[in-house]
Amino acid sequence: MSFVHQKCRNIDTVYLGSNIHRLNVPDNLVKWSQEWSGYNPPAHTDPKVDGAVWADPEIDEKTFQPSWNAIDGKINRVSYVCQYSFDPVTLRPLNPIGRTGLSGRGLLGRWGPNHAADPIVSRTNDNGDLEFVAVQRHDNGEWAIPGGMVDAGEHVSQTLRREFAEEAMHGIVDSENLDELWNNGKELYRGYVDDPRNTDNAWMETVVFNFHDSKGLLKNVALQAGDDAKALRWIAVNSNEPLYASHSHFIDLLKESHSH
């Protein structure tokens, strides 16, 4: 895989919610296949993760017997990228893209892949410009596609609809007027996310679907930021607005899919 992650190697700022800086990982030493005998990054798992019902326990806890690279009960531990491997000493899963300069789980609940779903709801405005719904994140103020984590036992299609409702419709999930919109989604991406929360042992993956409102179904729907977001607005795809994590790449895929 030629892709090299950037946002989860940022050493200019501390890791979200902590005072910890990542170890600097040069581009040529990102891949695990590159020998780096002295690699010893700081370890960090946020206190909010420790003991949380939605999170894994520590990897060496005797009662923790996960099925890696598999559907583990209600938890999907399969990576969209590849069969991930493990650190021979700690037995922790290894980020398939490579080193991040931080071990542990950071803010992520699961060892290995942490699955999300990102719905891009789009329309063509009166000027003929393609736009999408974006929300402003509380944690860092960046604009993002509404989305979130797939709950244990939840199907991705449910997550897409639920997350958009929670973040952009003030929690009104069952708006029958929008069934037609939700039933005509197009998958744009399935894979790894260069997310600032990623670590050597826990990382974000997502499925991105586009739901294009070609019939004006949203005209009579009051879109407003939910509790998880600071603000909401439509953003034109050609505005070059800086976006969170890999979301700019997803918008490039949206543009590409509407250019045919």
UniProtKB/Swiss-Prot annotation:
<dbReference type="GO" id="GO:0046872">
    <property type="term" value="F:metal ion binding"/>
</dbReference>
<keyword id="KW-0479">Metal-binding</keyword>
<keyword id="KW-0460">Magnesium</keyword>
<comment type="similarity">
    <text>Belongs to the Nudix hydrolase family.</text>
</comment>
<dbReference type="Pfam" id="PF00293">
    <property type="entry name" value="NUDIX"/>
</dbReference>
<feature type="binding site">
    <location>
        <position position="163"/>
    </location>
    <ligand>
        <name>Mg(2+)</name>
    </ligand>
</feature>
<keyword id="KW-0464">Manganese</keyword>
<feature type="short sequence motif" description="Nudix box">
    <location>
        <begin position="148"/>
        <end position="170"/>
    </location>
</feature>
<dbReference type="InterPro" id="IPR000086">
    <property type="entry name" value="NUDIX_hydrolase_dom"/>
</dbReference>
<feature type="binding site">
    <location>
        <position position="167"/>
    </location>
    <ligand>
        <name>Mg(2+)</name>
    </ligand>
</feature>
<comment type="function">
    <text>Probably mediates the hydrolysis of some nucleoside diphosphate derivatives.</text>
</comment>
<protein>
    <recommendedName>
        <fullName>Putative nudix hydrolase 6</fullName>
        <ecNumber>3.-.-.-</ecNumber>
    </recommendedName>
</protein>
<dbReference type="GO" id="GO:0047631">
    <property type="term" value="F:ADP-ribose diphosphatase activity"/>
</dbReference>
<dbReference type="InterPro" id="IPR039989">
    <property type="entry name" value="NUDT9"/>
</dbReference>
<feature type="domain" description="Nudix hydrolase">
    <location>
        <begin position="113"/>
        <end position="257"/>
    </location>
</feature>
<dbReference type="InterPro" id="IPR015797">
    <property type="entry name" value="NUDIX_hydrolase-like_dom_sf"/>
</dbReference>
<keyword id="KW-0378">Hydrolase</keyword>
